[in-house]
Curated annotation (Swiss-Prot):
Naturally occurring in which organism (per UniProt): Staphylococcus saprophyticus subsp. saprophyticus (strain ATCC 15305 / DSM 20229 / NCIMB 8711 / NCTC 7292 / S-41)
Primary localisation category: cytoplasm
Lineage: Bacteria, Bacillati, Bacillota, Bacilli, Bacillales
Record-given protein name: Probable manganese-dependent inorganic pyrophosphatase
Superkingdom field: Bacteria
InterPro entries attached to this UniProt entry: DDH_dom, DHH_sf, DHHA2, DHHA2_dom_sf, Mn-dep_inorganic_PyrPase
Protein residues bound to Mn(2+) 1: H9, D13, D75
Residues noted as binding Mn(2+) 2 in the record, renumbered to the chain: D15, D75, H97, D149
EC number: 3.6.1.1
Gene assigned in the entry: ppaC
Keyword Metal-binding applies: yes
Record's subcellular location: Cytoplasm
Length: 309
């Protein structure tokens, strides 16, 4: 049987890494012994905390050419967020919880997308539907992904299905959701030792919005001011990256995981449209967005609408 490559998006977060591992386990239980998890970037400290806690090894970094290779995508579908050779791959499955855009295949495929807070929640449902065993480490990764994507159930993207999945899994993983979740989020929230490049790339995605290409990065922190103390450096790097990658707009969303608010930093020719999107006036390229924590639900749709009016 040919190998099946399974991976999440570039600049992977906890859901992207965890869901690749989980999906590989799921596929192996179906009899696909060659299903193998990979990653499209470095493992962040939050994700590493989860992997270490449940004694799971991170997937290998994908360097292979995927031309004519069997592929399963998790936690994304847009080709610009995927492997560089994805257009030449044979995409077999997609399991995702995001919008569908810039995606097409030459052949039919299994596609499962649900409006829930986390890909791991969908995978949990798939295990239950098939009656597959959920091992403790798999349960732990599912919980970690759900907590990460939902900011410990505070994000507006979090659904009752996400909460129910985490509650059902906690006894298998042997964790207290609140205490484990807070420690995991804190592990990824410090920016003191991160370079400007790290901050901008650790959880960044590119989006085609009408005629514009927009880069939106997000960093979770317990101290927004700590990040914005380096605003000048951040802006310089954002402008350089935008020039090199031809981004029309670069938005950095700095999210306070304790108070559930965000402050944004915006550069690019279309930056005034961001002010329109959130009904705010940018002050020194920044704006405070109370209650905004979700890129998927509270940032991407709003900016898309402003850019495509």
């Amino acid at each position: 049987m040919a190998k099946t490559y399974i991976f999440g998006h570039k600049n992977p977060d906890t859901d992207a890494i965890s869901s690749a591992i989980i999906m590989a386990d799921f596929e192996q239980q179906t009899g696909n012994a060659e299903a193998t998890a990979y990653r499209l970037g470095e493992v962040g400290p939050e994700t590493q905390y989860a992997l270490d806690h449940f004694n799971v090894t991170a997937p290998e970094l994908l360097n292979d050419d995927l031309a004519d290779q069997n592929v399963i995508l998790v936690d994304h579908n847009e080709f610009q967020q995927s492997a560089d050779s994805i257009a030449d791959a044979a995409v077999q499955h997609v399991v995702d919880h995001h919008r569908i855009a810039n995606f097409e295949t030459a052949a039919p495929l299994y596609y499962r997308a649900e409006p829930v807070g986390c890909t791991a929640t969908i995978l949990y449902k798939m295990y239950k539907e098939r009656g597959f065993e959920i091992k403790p480490e798999i349960a732990g990764l599912m919980i970690s992904a759900i907590i990460s994507d939902s900011l410990l159930f505070k994000s507006p993207t979090c659904t009752e299905q996400d909460v129910q999945a985490a509650e059902a899994l906690k006894s298998i993983a042997n964790v207290d959701l609140e205490s484990y979740g807070l420690e995991m989020l804190k592990a990824g929230a410090s920016t003191k030792d991160k370079s400007v490049s790290d901050i901008l790339s650790m959880d960044a995605k590119s989006f085609n919005m009408g005629d514009f290409v927009t880069r939106i990065g997000q960093v979770n922190t317990v101290d927004i001011d700590e990040v914005f103390a380096r605003q000048e450096e951040l802006e310089k790097e954002m402008l350089e990256v935008s020039a090199n990658e031809k981004y029309d707009l670069f938005v950095l969303v700095v999210t306070d995981i304790i108070n559930s608010d965000s402050k944004i930093l915006v550069v690019g020719a279309e930056k005034d449209k961001v002010g329109v999107a959130f009904n705010v006036t940018l002050d020194n390229n920044t704006a405070f967005l109370p209650g905004v924590v979700s890129r998927k639900k509270q940032v991407v749709p709003q900016i898309t609408e402003a850019l495509t009016k």
